[in-house]
UniProtKB/Swiss-Prot annotation:
This is Cytosolic Fe-S cluster assembly factor Nubp2 homolog. Component of the cytosolic iron-sulfur (Fe/S) protein assembly (CIA) machinery. Required for maturation of extramitochondrial Fe-S proteins. The Nubp1-Nubp2 heterotetramer forms a Fe-S scaffold complex, mediating the de novo assembly of an Fe-S cluster and its transfer to target apoproteins. The lineage of its organism: Eukaryota, Metazoa, Ecdysozoa, Arthropoda, Hexapoda. Pfam families: ParA (PF10609). [4Fe-4S] cluster binds at C188, C191.
Amino acid sequence: MLDKVKNVIVVLSGKGGVGKSTVSTQLALALRATGHKVGLLDIDLCGPSVPHLLGLEGRDIYQCDDGWVPIYTDESKTLAVMSIGFLLKNRNDPVIWRGPKKTMMIKQFLTDVKWEDLDYLIIDTPPGTSDEHITVMECMREVPCNGAIIVTTPQGVALDDVRKELTFCKKTGIKVLGIVENMSGFVCPHCSDCTNIFSSFGGAELAQLAQVPLLGTLPIDPRVGVLAGSTASVLNELADSSTAQVLRSIVQHLDGLTALPTSA
């Protein structure tokens, strides 16, 4: 039930291990920190990490007459979360499902969750281009979707997979809002200098080639890693960090596209 959702943003990645779920989670927290009501939907059925990243493991979801009730992280209901991780008894339990069952579950997530009034719904998808992605895109035809943010890393192999993701978006008719290059350098925890430990500028070159915006480059920052397992936003806890600056810029970019006001 997305009738109360103003904007839907899909977060994609060409391959696993690029930090897509971390970017999705921190983007949702950044949007909330700037005054928006946000939903975060984790449809990575085989590797749901959002409950862990937000410290929500062990929470139970319930059904009401209108569908599943998402997990709220605060009494004001400014951040609502839904993930298959809440349906698993143990985080280490594998999800061994064939395609049709995965498709059915994703459709349920997109149609049977009772989202309240939301400014943004962030959808964290599995890596690659699979049945799950096709299901999401088919469901999005019935609901206005603003577009996709693609997360990559500077390495060549990751960029090759992003090219496939861009082609997928083009063929399925979803607009690419921009590219985020994650793990772009390492921030020293002692002096705060950033050192490029992988290739550099790959995300910028790919964005230029695809003629889409480069939304920002996020470094590996150990201080950000410490926030995992909580609902603390980088914008509040590390306000002067380069990660916070990039996330703030992405929020402003999205608000500019959707004409939603951002609070200070």
